């Protein structure tokens, strides 16, 4: 009996193709190849890493800031006040999450991601 260990790194702009290819490992199993993932037997499947965050950051910050202003305007209107200028603003950290939240399924194993940022903007109110 022989044990061969190999890790394959694939960089692709077509993650759907990589996911489809990973689904064909059952053919290897039917030929008698034993696959392992760490300490457990069975294929671990591909890991999907999102690398385009820097391209999205400016638009996401602009959108978060615009939504903060809309919420502040509504708050001011409901309070019978007018919205003043920005008192303070902080950009939170960017978070990459799995699109589908499921117990035991990690973000990296899911091809589709959700990216979020929280911007905290404090406005002054005018009476």
Region locations from a protein language model:
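Short, charged, surface-exposed interaction patches
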Residues: 1-127
């Amino acid at each position: 009996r022989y044990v061969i260990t190999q890790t394959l790194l694939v960089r692709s702009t077509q993650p759907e193709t990589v996911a489809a290819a990973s689904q064909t490992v059952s053919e290897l199993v039917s030929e008698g190849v034993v696959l392992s993932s760490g300490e457990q037997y069975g294929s671990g499947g591909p890991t999907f890493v999102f690398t385009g965050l820097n391209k999205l950051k400016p638009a996401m910050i602009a959108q978060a800031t615009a939504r903060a202003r809309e919420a502040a305007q509504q708050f001011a209107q409901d309070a019978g006040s007018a919205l003043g200028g920005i008192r303070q603003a902080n950009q939170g950290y960017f978070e990459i999450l799995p699109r589908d939240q499921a117990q035991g399924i990690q973000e990296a194993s899911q091809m589709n991601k959700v990216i979020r940022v929280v911007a905290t903007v404090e406005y002054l109110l005018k009476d």
